[in-house]
Amino acid sequence: MDERAPTDEPVEYAREDVSVLVVGAGAAGARAAIELAERGVDDVLVLGKRGHGDAHTTWARGGINGALGTHDPEDSPAIHAADTLNEGHLINDPGKVETVTAQMPERLRELDDWGMAYSRTDDGAIDQRFFGAQSFRRTAFAGDHTGESLLNTLVDRAQALSVPYRENVMITKLVSDGEAVHGAVGFDMDDGEFVLFNAGTVVLAAGGHAAIYNRHTSRDDENNGDGAALAFDGGASLMDMEFMQFHPTGMAVDEADPEWAPWSGRLVTEAVRGEGGRLFNAEGERFMERYSPDQMELDARDVVARAIAREIGEGRGTEHGGVYLDISHRDADFIEERLPRMYERFQDLGVDMAEEPVEVAPTSHYGMGGVAVDDHGETDVDDLFAIGETMAGVHGANRLGGNSLAETVAYGVVAGERIADRVDGPGEVPDALREETVEPHLRDLRAMADNDGANEVDAVLADLRELMWEHAGILRDESSLREGLDRLAAVRDRAADMRVGPVTSESFELAVDAGFMLVAAEAVLRGALEREESRGAHYRTDHPDTDPDWRRNVYFDAADVGGMTLRTEPVDQPSDAVQAALDEGHELDYHQLE
């Protein structure tokens, strides 16, 4: 955020009173609002940065996990939890993991009751497919557009319950004294009006921070760390920020070709591999046989991503800096039925997946870290909740595919239950906070608008994303991380003097994003430097082994004089049932796909 001194002239702003303010209109925010409405809380407002139903949830393709046992009746929530902990390299919060896995069979059936368009077996049951590093087929899906189907279902349910939404509003700051939250400040992206929301409870369901990298699966104006930065600025702690998931299969394209360039890094769903897709290097070798002969293409995402990065780095990459993903051994009808959106996307670009492979390379996809919360999704700031990708704790050092959508609906319910039990009417921002926090912040925003600074916003963001890819990417070491922090400081200086348009302009939105991204980027770099081991998605070439003494979570707190301080805490132990599942050591039978 621009720190230049504003004038003292008062800033006009609207005020809106609400008992519960939900920031984020994706699956997590929608499900929390539904739970509140079903429990009789009608004074709720859901805010979205885009039009109704247009959230990042719709970009989640492959599926949503739950131990239904459609094909594998021996599956269970305890085994699902064990797989999640193993994939997270045992630094997940076991309580949060079990909260999600225990709920998911019921949540999947509930979505079915609400009309979700699941893909189905021949006898009409909810179909489930393989996803990487899972012991059984537990990923329910709607073709390869599961997130879109999920959000449509939740939006329809919310509308049936008359849940109020407000579109095209961006929150820029929480109103917090560090002990409790009292509301939030933002602006209407259509007309430029500043708004103070007096809220008794605030729920951050604002996504993650994967777009702080220059190759990412998000749209450029989302997943820029809004939720984490807002919470951190409001006095909440962050956790596990060093763990960034690089999805193995983002599109690798000719970036000089205007038709292909916008697709660089965009997700090629894991469902392609779950349905039998195979990875080959430029020499025609199915290289996962060298890295993971048992699980092959369906090993953990961090394993597959590092394998692809190594193939590219050692000169066995394809023309556009990737490897080949090939599902052409499947019939065209099968691909069109099971992967309709992927098939259509590549058809539109002139590639027939049924006839030829596509080029893929790792891409930033998901931040396992986020805001530290308790078992109900509440932060250490009273009445401030964080759910979905904004929260930390469920995924540990690496995330199972299909668990992100599961987390959104499970913790939407959990947070909604807790809030409904104690909601106490609209908030009221104390006069002192309004004078010391709200009004100075609004003057800062006004001063940032129409500023004729020296640096273009797009150039500042591009530099930030480039340095994160170079210094905090798939492979890390101390020297590079320290250089990344130095470069980040220089970017921060440039961000203080940007050329910004009016409040309704895209450049103003992105300038606000820049402030959020700087917080998230610093936490990722500092956490990666602090964790002197390799674990899951965090790989240090100068500390390549996993250290049992580092089975701890890194927390990030705001320092009294600015910046952040780091501390570590040990991880809790799982329940007896989940520990038994861990001890049994269930393992995917990959060869069922051959």
Regions found by a protein language model. Give the residues of each.
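Glycine-rich loop(s) and the adjacent beta-strand/alpha-helix scaffold that form part
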Residues: T201-D257, L298, G317, N398, ...
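N-terminal Rossmann-like FAD-binding beta1-loop-alpha1 element of flavoenzymes
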Residues: V20-V46
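An anion/pyrophosphate-binding glycine-rich loop and adjacent beta-alpha core
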Residues: L230, A236-D352, R418, R422-D424
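Glycine- and aromatic-enriched mobile tails/lids
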Residues: D2-V18, A32-E35, G51-G53, T58-A60, ...
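Conserved redox-cofactor binding core of oxidoreductases
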Residues: R107, D113-E193, N198, H247-E259
